[in-house]
């Protein structure tokens, strides 16, 4: 596992995301509805739905809202056939970028995604151009815990890897299908999970300086502002020193 903090890069963007909470909720609900529609409403038998529920909870969505979205999906939703599409490309500084979309119209989606890359000095690549650099994983964050006890609980719950960060927080990596089970095991052991989500972990990182980092963040902002875009993954590394200058 690459020795970097995925959560640190997420935190750099939390303030901006909080300002777009309404749009984030819309995208979370769309994923909940689609996951339930495709795989049923039982979170125990539907890993995609369980992952969607965990992510919604991490973003402070209420259980009532989550349950209503699941019920919509089980009932067939609104009749729209949503499909997951992954677009790959290169961002500023040679960073690898993967864009996960949920859409009923591929032409509309690509017309949103391609200009974002172009305007930020990047370019949209072909399928497989950067995907080989990423692995789909579950990521769980626990803040300030007894390292030995948490490690034991995480391993017993089925975690693949555990990384302690400089600030004392612990990042726990799992097979994406096991995210819910591992999260449950950690919580049963008495630890508070701050965040749990399915993500794409890069095998190599690209260090970004104070000139390049804002360009990548602008690209991410533009992509996430697209209605069809659910998640944006990249291998840009933004140090605390560079982040402080942004």
UniProtKB/Swiss-Prot annotation:
Listed Gene3D superfamilies: 1.10.10.200, 3.30.70.980
Pfam families: TACO1_YebC_N, Transcrip_reg
Keywords, comma-separated and alphabetical: Cytoplasm, DNA-binding, Transcription, Transcription regulation
Any Gene Ontology biological process: regulation of DNA-templated transcription
Coiled coil: none
GO MF annotations, alphabetized: DNA binding
Any one of the GO CC terms: cytosol
Chief location: cytoplasm
Membrane-crossing segments per the record: none
Subcellular location: Cytoplasm
Protein family (similarity comment): Belongs to the TACO1 family.
Entry-linked PANTHER family: TRANSCRIPTIONAL REGULATORY PROTEIN YEBC-RELATED, TRANSLATIONAL ACTIVATOR OF CYTOCHROME C OXIDASE 1
NCBIfam families associated with the record: PRK00110.1 (NF001030), PRK12378.1 (NF009044), YebC/PmpR family DNA-binding transcriptional regulator (TIGR01033)
Protein name stated in the entry: Probable transcriptional regulatory protein HSM_1763
Native organism: Histophilus somni (strain 2336)
Lineage: Bacteria, Pseudomonadati, Pseudomonadota, Gammaproteobacteria, Pasteurellales
